[in-house]
């Protein structure tokens, strides 16, 4: 016998809405309920929120507990925060109900070094309920960690890995452009970064930690540098209608590295700014053989993130129990034709 995978979604922000639309399109997914704390969404039907025809029977609940009392979910998908501390109570609630968990929380993509105690608790709880928990996304979760890990498979030896993600941020949604500082003065950029009003890119450390563990480098120094603003050389108007004068911030550069015995082994670089003339994702493996992969045009972040989440549903359900990372799951791939068997 086979049937669709049942899913409850928590979080209907800009990225959550994109994922919800894809859930509704997938023939192997049954989106049972959506949860969001926004009072303006209370008891509204999902189709009106997403401005689509599908999903008319799905209403928005204010709490996960209510949704779980109504429906049994194979997977609870959480898209609420980058902070694991904030997301952990929802994860625990989902696990206790017997549901697997997939989350876009960047800190969950590799939480073991930054949250050792909490990671141990989540792992033990998930194993006690025979479910799995994973943090994912296009980045962290795939392009700058899992993909370079997999690309090393045909290498006899690996000395050094460099990954670069180059983005034209003008093509991305408004919250992304704002979190990388678009439209700020250089002084405002640094003040807001320091006060965590804007986050810049989150996840380079987690990506390095995942690569380091997968390849067994055992790096003794991992460092993320402060994000550096990129200044616009001309006046422009953002995709959401804000005028940005010449000399103001139009994006940022973030980078992180890992060393072993003073030798650099991993270098990650994330560059995103408006009207970037070249978009790509590149991976260089210095080893035997040397490998250079470049995805011309890059992978669209929002489309890719939604696809990663939705394609992961069958993989997570069939994975071993516990707190996992993307490298621990069955090989990720397109899964629309995969149904649940019982």
Regions found by a protein language model. Give the residues of each.
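N-terminal Rossmann-like dinucleotide-binding module
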Residues: 1-51
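Active-site-lining helix/loop region of Rossmann-like oxidoreductase modules
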Residues: 6, 10, 14, 152-279, ...
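Short, ordered loop/turn segments at secondary-structure junctions
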Residues: 37-39, 81, 105-109, 138-139, ...
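Conserved N-terminal Rossmann-fold NAD(P) cofactor-binding segment
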Residues: 38-71
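Rossmann-fold NAD(P) dinucleotide-binding segment
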Residues: 66-75, 84-106
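General beta-strand structural signal in soluble alpha/beta enzymes
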Residues: 103, 133-136, 162-163
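Rossmann-fold NAD(P)-binding glycine/threonine-rich loop
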Residues: 106-131
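C-terminal helical cap and adjacent loop that interface with cofactors, partners, or active-site loops
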Residues: 273-342
């Amino acid at each position: 016998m086979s049937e669709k995978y049942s899913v409850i979604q928590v979080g209907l922000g800009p990225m959550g809405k994109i994922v919800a639309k894809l859930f509704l399109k997938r023939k192997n997914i049954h989106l049972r309920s959506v949860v969001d704390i926004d009072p303006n969404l209370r008891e509204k039907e999902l189709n009106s929120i997403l401005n689509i025809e599908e999903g008319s029977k799905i209403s928005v609940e204010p709490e996960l507990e209510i949704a779980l009392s109504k429906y049994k979910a194979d997977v609870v998908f959480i898209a609420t925060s980058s902070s694991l501390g904030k997301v952990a109570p929802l994860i625990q609630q989902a696990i206790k109900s017997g549901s697997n968990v997939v989350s876009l929380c960047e800190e969950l993509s590799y939480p073991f070094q930054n949250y050792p105690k909490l990671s141990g608790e989540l792992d033990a709880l998930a194993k006690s309920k025979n479910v799995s928990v994973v943090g994912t996304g296009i980045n962290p979760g795939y392009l700058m960690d899992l993909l370079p890990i997999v690309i090393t498979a045909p290498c006899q030896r690996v000395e050094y890995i460099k990954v670069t993600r180059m983005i034209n941020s003008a093509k991305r949604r408004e919250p992304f452009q704002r979190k990388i500082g678009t439209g700020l003065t250089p002084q405002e950029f640094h003040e807001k970064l320091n006060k965590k009003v804007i986050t810049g890119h989150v996840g380079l450390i987690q990506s390095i930690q995942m690569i380091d563990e997968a390849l067994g480098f055992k790096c003794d120094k991992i460092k993320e540098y402060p994000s550096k603003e990129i200044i616009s050389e001309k006046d422009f108007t953002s995709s959401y209608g804000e005028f940005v004068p010449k000399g103001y911030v139009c994006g940022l550069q973030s980078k992180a590295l890992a060393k072993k015995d003073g030798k650099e082994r991993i270098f990650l670089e994330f560059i995103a700014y408006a009207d970037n003339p070249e978009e790509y994702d590149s991976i260089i493996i210095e080893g035997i053989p040397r490998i250079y992969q470049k995805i011309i045009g890059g992978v669209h972040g929002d489309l890719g993130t939604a696809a990663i989440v939705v394609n992961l549903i069958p993989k997570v359900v069939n994975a071993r129990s516990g707190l996992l990372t993307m490298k621990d799951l069955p090989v990720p791939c397109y899964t629309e034709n995969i149904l649940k068997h019982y």
